[in-house]
A protein has these predicted regions:
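A general marker of short, structured functional hotspots
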Residues: 9-12, 20, 26, 88, ...
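Short, surface-exposed linear patches
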Residues: 30-33, 87, 160-161
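Basic, glycine-/proline-tolerant helical and adjacent loop/strand elements
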Residues: 1-70
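C-terminal, charged low-complexity interaction regions
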Residues: 94-171
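Charged, low-complexity interaction segments
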Residues: 45-128
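Surface-exposed beta-strand edges and their flanking turn/coil or helix-capping segments
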Residues: 31-39, 75-78, 92-95, 151-152
Length: 171
């Protein structure tokens, strides 16, 4: 197994070392709000988000999705957000730092990832972790390419293509 993932970027010519890791500061549902609505309807921290609306409150948690890279020890990491039910959000936040790591919360994927067809509302399970670690995200099986990469892994070439698209846009 290769110790570290590295590639020479076809866009900028730089050598990038270490498995790719990209993250989102907020769920897509927060990002589309006006600045006024962000101030009046939403609460956002590094790990949690709540958005009020006439229909009720939406709850989100920041999680980590790991995609294995064939022949590489460290996975491709996405820091993304998932929506949780009010009950799951309350249970998750009430056990902060003392989670039952065998617990699982159903959630909906809440960011659009580049390279992939629309990832909003992919079915997920959130697995809490202790020790200050963000929860681990499990995707439910589906025909979506992100789910395929989650279960079957990425080739080194695919990981490079995705990283280049995130860093430089377009493919």
């Amino acid at each position: 197994m290769v110790a570290i993932f590295e590639f020479t970027c076809s866009c900028c010519g730089k050598l990038h070392e270490g498995s790719p890791s990209f993250g989102y500061k907020a769920p897509m549902h927060y990002e589309v709000l006006s600045e006024q609505d962000k101030q009046s309807l939403a609460t956002l921290t590094d790990d949690l988000c709540e958005i009020d609306s006439p229909e009720g409150t939406d709850y989100f948690a920041r999680v980590v999705l790991e995609l294995p890279i064939h022949g590489v020890e460290e996975p491709f990491l996405w820091g993304v957000w998932v929506s949780l039910s009010e009950e799951s959000f309350a249970r998750y936040t009430s056990t902060w730092g003392e989670h039952d790591e065998s617990d699982s919360y159903f959630g909906w994927f809440s960011n659009r990832l580049p390279y992939y067809p629309d990832t909003i509302n992919l079915k997920t399970n959130v697995r809490p972790r202790n020790g200050g670690l963000r929860p681990y995200l499990e995707l439910e099986p589906s025909a979506h390419p992100l789910a395929t990469h989650y279960f079957e892994g990425l080739s080194i070439q695919e990981a490079q293509r995705i990283a280049e698209e995130v860093m430089h846009g377009g493919s």
